[in-house]
């Protein structure tokens, strides 16, 4: 029998032609038969054709869809989704959705993709607003280093390695909030119930020294802690049991930050390096070098970049992961007038406003606003948390007969910063007993204190802050989480006596849905 490979193509063509001729003859026979046969033939051919179409649709739905048709289909689906969300928020019929409202939502999404969306929350906070406060004490006996939240659960951690899980129990006020639109400042009453806790077991996969920082993954599945033992421990958020332990750092882990919308994590350490991790694959990605001193803080948003502060090297660095480059911003170069006469010795904390702006806090009490397009700060606010009281001569000298000359008062450090991403609201903390809220001006060239009648009062040193937005529409609120204690987060440089170690949660109701404004581009 001959191999089909060696057969001549002419024979194959002839066979194909003969096959087609046979089909034509069969069709002619069917036409000669009655109309019943025609109906049967048409029915069979249509069913075969429809079955063939179903198979194509099941296997490849978008095979025969052009690029323009696909864009049109996706745009219609997106508009329908936005309209449904607006209807749910406003409580009116879809036909009544105004074009301006829909256009503002589309503009908001575009600005969010560009990283230039600025939500105006500060103008929606009534100065006479009623703020509800809850204190998280639980089993914590050491200073807290972090308080984070995901949906209805709150997690707190202290230096001893104790991690406590809380559940929020919300009770609405008796008066109807739908009618007053927060004009008289109604808030949701806060109650938190401890439901689980976990202590460090000092084992191979757990911490063996003090904890310094706390973070939670964006999907709420993992709780991550860093400590003085050079370790990063990943725990299950449900059971609080340690699942993984990374020992890549060569010194104490000082800070953790999650990339927004992903499970990519950045960690900074006293070994002067930043490491990038993936919580999805539970793997190490890369290491970033450049700082000359201990890296005390790191923060990140949606893009593949992060901002870090290097302590006494007095620099802030923007790390561009994809471009494999970094931008260096040097502090301490401003005039003595801008710092109220106090020299800057260390940059201790950082918070990103958007992809192009961030704020830093220093040990001389200065909060600085930076842009990635300029090497110098756009604006500095000196003595943001005031001065410490003057010490008595016997307190600052070891001599039996100290010199009566008084030492000038020293500024309170900025121990923590936090911001709502892509908004004009951020918060700062120290050990003066108050969390201060700040309003960024339009154009992002300055900021000022946000005045409210009821201060956000806490006890002790504010070691960590986090801000989040809760609810939608008329029920929207800004929630502030604070981790406080008798000592600072990474040492006993400042100790306060008679202060409980606890966390605090504040609910600040908003009057209406926040508006969106464009951020002006700042030229160098």
Curated annotation (Swiss-Prot):
Broad class of where this protein is predominantly found: nucleus
UniProt keywords, alphabetically: Nucleus, Repeat, WD repeat
PROSITE patterns referenced in this protein's UniProt entry, alphabetically: WD_REPEATS_2, WD_REPEATS_REGION
Record keyword Nucleus present: yes
Pfam families referenced in this protein's UniProt entry, alphabetically: WD40
Residue stretches of biased makeup (Basic and acidic residues): 21-32
Gene Ontology CC: nucleolus; nucleus; small-subunit processome
Protein localization: Nucleus
GO molecular function: snoRNA binding; U3 snoRNA binding
Ranges annotated as biased composition (Acidic residues): 51-64
SUPFAM superfamilies the record matches: WD40 repeat-like
Chain residue ranges for the region called Disordered: 1-65
Ranges: WD repeats: 131-176, 206-245, 248-287, 290-329, 342-380, 409-448, 457-503
GO terms (BP aspect): maturation of SSU-rRNA
UniProt key word 4Fe-4S: no
Name the record gives this protein: Uncharacterized WD repeat-containing protein C2E1P5.05
Organism of this sequence: Schizosaccharomyces pombe (strain 972 / ATCC 24843)
């Amino acid at each position: 029998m001959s191999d089909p490979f060696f057969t001549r193509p002419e024979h194959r063509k002839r066979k194909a032609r003969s096959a087609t001729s046979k089909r034509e003859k069969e069709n002619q026979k069917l036409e000669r038969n009655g109309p019943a046969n025609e109906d049967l033939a048409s029915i069979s051919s249509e069913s075969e054709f429809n079955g063939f179409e179903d198979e194509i649709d099941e296997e490849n739905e978008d095979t025969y869809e052009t690029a323009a048709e696909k864009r049109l289909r996706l745009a219609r689906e997106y508009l329908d989704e936005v309209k449904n969300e607006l209807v749910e928020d406003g409580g009116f019929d879809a036909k009544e959705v105004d074009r301006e409202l829909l256009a503002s939502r589309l503009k908001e999404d575009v600005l969010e993709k560009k990283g230039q969306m600025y939500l105006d929350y500060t103008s929606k906070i009534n100065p006479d607003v009623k703020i509800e406060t809850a204190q998280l004490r639980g089993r914590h006996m050491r200073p807290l280093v972090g308080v984070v939240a995901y949906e209805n659960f709150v997690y707190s951690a202290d230096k001893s390695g104790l991690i406590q899980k809380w559940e929020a129990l919300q009770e609405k006020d008796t008066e109807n909030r739908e009618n007053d639109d927060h004009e008289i400042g109604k808030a949701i009453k806060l109650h938190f119930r401890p439901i689980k806790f976990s202590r460090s077991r000092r084992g191979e996969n757990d911490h063996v020294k003090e904890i310094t920082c706390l973070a939670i993954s964006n999907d709420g599945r993992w709780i991550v802690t860093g400590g003085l033992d050079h370790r990063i421990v990943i725990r299950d958020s449900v059971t609080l049991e340690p699942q993984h332990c990374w020992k890549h750092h060569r010194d104490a882990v000082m800070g953790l930050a999650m990339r927004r919308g992903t499970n990519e994590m950045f960690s900074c350490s006293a070994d002067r390096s930043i490491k990038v991790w993936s919580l999805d694959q539970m793997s190490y990605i890369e290491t970033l070098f450049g700082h000359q001193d201990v890296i005390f803080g790191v923060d990140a948003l949606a893009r593949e970049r992060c901002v870090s502060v290097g302590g006494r090297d007095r620099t802030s660095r923007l790390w561009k992961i994809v471009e494999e480059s970094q931008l260096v911003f040097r502090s301490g170069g401003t005039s003595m007038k801008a710092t109220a006469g106090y020299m800057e010795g260390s940059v201790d904390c950082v918070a990103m406003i958007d992809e192009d702006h961030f704020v830093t806090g220093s040990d001389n009490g200065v909060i600085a606003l930076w842009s990635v397009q300029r090497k110098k700060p756009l604006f500095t606010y000196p003595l943001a948390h005031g001065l410490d009281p003057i010490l008595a001569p016997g307190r600052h000298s070891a001599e039996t007969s100290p010199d009566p000359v008084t030492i000038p008062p020293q500024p309170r450090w900025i121990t923590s910063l936090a911001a709502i991403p892509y908004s004009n609201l951020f918060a700062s903390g120290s050990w003066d007993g108050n969390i201060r809220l700040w309003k960024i001006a339009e154009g992002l060239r300055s900021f000022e204190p946000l005045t409210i009648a009821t201060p956000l009062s806490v006890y002790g040193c504010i070691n960590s802050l986090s801000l989040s937005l809760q609810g939608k529409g008329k029920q929207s609120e800004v929630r502030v989480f604070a981790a406080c204690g008798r000592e600072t987060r990474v040492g006993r440089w400042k100790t306060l006596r008679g202060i409980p170690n606890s966390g605090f949660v504040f609910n600040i109701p908003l009057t209406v849905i926040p508006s969106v404004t464009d951020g002006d581009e700042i030229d160098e």
